[in-house]
Amino acid sequence: MLNWIRSGAPWIWLTGGAVSISLLSVLGLLLLIGWKGLTYFWPAPLYQWNVTSLTPVQGEVLHENTILIGQIYERSFVPRSYLPVDAVKKLDEDEDFATRLNIKIANRELYPADFISVLQMQLDEPTTPKEWAVIERSSGGYFFGKLVAFQDGDKLYQTDIQTVLNKKLDDAETLRHEIDSLVVDQLKDLGWKLEQLRLDKRKHELNNTVTDDFLAQNLQQKEQVEQELAKLDLQLDGLRLQLSGYALIVEDMTGSHVSIPLEDILDYWYPNQMSLPDKVMHWGKQVWKFLSEDPRESNSEGGVFPAIFGTVFLVLIMSIIVMPLGVVAAIYLHEYAKNNAFTRIIRIAVINLAGVPSIVYGVFGLGFFVYTIGASIDNVFYAERLPAPTFGTPGLLWSALTLAVFTLPVVIVTTEEGLTRIPSSVRHGSLALGATQFETLWRVVLPMATPAIITGLILAIARAAGEVAPLMLVGVVKLASSLPVDGQFPYVHLDRKFMHLGFHIYDVGFQTSNIEAARPLVYATSFLLVTVIVGLNLTAISIRNNLREKYRTLGQD
């Protein structure tokens, strides 16, 4: 036994077990958030229960001989000691737990909450009626009901409702796309022109160069733009009017008839009539909508495309900033600076910077970048916009710079380690052939150190992509009205605020009023953030591997 311990075999098993536990933990975490997130888009069946007794639910009472329609959201087990006396009497002697159902009943405008919690013993066996539909709305959440009629102005269709509704939904979708196109392509452009005219006038006033001819020309252009705006408003009002006048009449679980305007209906489906291929197609459609649409209902519904775009774009801008700074700093420290007390202090400071909490970088970015540099830029280049700030307020540029400072130590350390691994004989050979130190560095050393530089980029992306705390101070918002990139000059707007997947997770998980409904969305967004980070890292790793193979013959590896 002692010989076996002295051989080192136990430590091999110990390290192997630690690696296995780490891998299982990571895979288990990914499976958990992946399963809970991706099942959010699966069309869950609608159940119907008959209430068999007076059932208290969240301060209210479900009366006998009524039906309950909903989706089973969660099952939990309640110990016997936690149950009311009447519920304990219904338990068998050998039963120590009762099953509690968390049921989503939707229909938010009719009931005080989307969810109710009830003991399963107080309900009879559920059925899955095929006539009940799930209606997805632009506001108000989902609606569960039976289609009764479709109202087209004065006409009321009570037969072949689905055919009429499908046609009207297609027409409504076409009108929505046309309205969105006019708003994005023309309305925003006209608003931008009006703002530019106002700023141009303000700039001339500040420079004391206002003339009567300029004022007349400015007024004429303003009136022309306002006329175009008035025409566009009339066109938009006409399109919106075409959406009104239609309504779907639906019966809810109490037997009441509810009128839902067509303009509020996004989609509908019968989950209990779907086959497995239908459910798979519906799941894929919902996943695509999640990835490609904007959020709605205070981020608790809809898609996350602005957050995906903001996250990826922020990482790209951060990488563009941090890579030159980190590489140049590492080159100076390794190739040019003397090994004295000053450079040793710099290296110690760089290493210690990696341990500073991220929120401290956020405070630094807010105080230095936003309030100092940003305010100075506004005073010099955007005086006509004051007192409204342009760069003197949190935005994408300051967020990227803050994350660049946050990840700078990682890039410096990995790049310097890569430069250290290059054999000195390579440098001496280049210098012996007549190359200068800069030519040796540019044509020989840096290409061979590229894999290490890309490794620094990978670590920087992995560290920065999921950071939220500093971004809350320097640019991220709950909902951004515009993307940082659009068709208006200068096309890339680094002064704009943006959305981020990490902050979106925090906002949906802790800031929404309907936390039960938003919980699956938290898992889905978390899984998406992990996927985005892994995708960015795999891209950088593939580039590094290609470069490593390219310079392998030079003895780099």
How should each PLM-predicted stretch be described?
Residues M1-G16, S20-G28, G34-N299, G555-D557:
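Membrane-topology segments of multi-pass transport proteins
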Residues P324-A329, V360-V363, W398, V405-V426, ...:
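Membrane-embedded alpha-helices of multi-pass transport/permease systems
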Residues I412-E416, P423, Q437-G475:
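Transmembrane alpha-helices
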Residues E416-S424, I458, F503-D557:
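C-terminal transmembrane helix and the adjacent membrane-cytosol boundary/short C-terminal tail
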Residues S298, G475-F527:
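Interhelical loop and adjacent transmembrane-helix boundary motif
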Residues M318-V350, V363, A540-E549:
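Transmembrane-helix boundary motif in ABC transporter permease subunits
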Residues W283-G302, A337, Y361-V405, G475-V477, ...:
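Membrane-interfacial helix termini and adjacent extracytoplasmic/periplasmic loops
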